[in-house]
Amino acid sequence: MESTLELTKIKEVLQKNLKILIILPLLFLIISAIVTFFVLSPKYQANTQILVNQTKGDNPQFMAQEVQSNIQLVNTYKEIVKSPRILDEVSKDLNNKYSPSKLSSMLTITNQENTQLINIQVKSGHKQDSEKIANSFAKVTSKQIPKIMSLDNVSILSKADGTAVKVAPKTVVNLIGAFFLGLVVALIYIFFKVIFDKRIKDEEDVEKELGLPVLGSIQKFN
């Protein structure tokens, strides 16, 4: 019975503040839409892969050892891809359109565990640039590693052509997140309003807050 009364009271409070519950989420939604579509710059990500591959051989035992050795080299090669030497060469390959430090901030290097694959991911504000830069990293790396490591065991597995996708801003996530944030803010506002606003506004408040019957009311005259 007590819980039913509490639920009824909550329902009444929400109904009284229905405008706030509608206006604040919509306001947050509109602000998020403006920021997402007109303020934030789009980001595109392109991906390419290079393979640390074994040398040719007929001995299965030798080939297995070579594969294991190449897997162990992957971490070293990942660091080489991010090194100043590679960044400088990529910058030159792109006619110095991007500085080495800028290229470094656009670059992400990953690899799947226990594989010989290195994934090169590049984020840029332009779709074509993302693909072009990713391809440049793959090309430069495959040329420079034999000079650095004295091992010619790197090849380009897949180019970035046609792989660029928009990764930011996340329109749906931003809009839904803003709507629910507005809803939470509205509920918090209503909660504090109920807690701290003790003003009596109508006959119903007199009966509830003071426990006194209302005998009559005075009309408001202009």
Swiss-Prot record:
One of its GO terms (biological process) is polysaccharide biosynthetic process. Keywords: Capsule biogenesis/degradation, Cell membrane, Exopolysaccharide synthesis, Membrane, Transmembrane, Transmembrane helix, Virulence. One of its GO terms (molecular function) is carbohydrate:proton symporter activity. It is a multi-pass membrane protein. The chain crosses the membrane at residues 20-40, 172-192. It is found in: Cell membrane. GO terms for cellular component: plasma membrane. InterPro entries: Bact_polysacc_biosynth/exp, CpsC-like, LPS_length_determ_N_term. Required for the biosynthesis of type 8 capsular polysaccharide (Cap8/CP8). Might act as the chain-length regulator. Belongs to the CpsC/CapA family. This is Capsular polysaccharide type 8 biosynthesis protein cap8A. It comes from Staphylococcus aureus. The lineage of its organism: Bacteria, Bacillati, Bacillota, Bacilli, Bacillales.
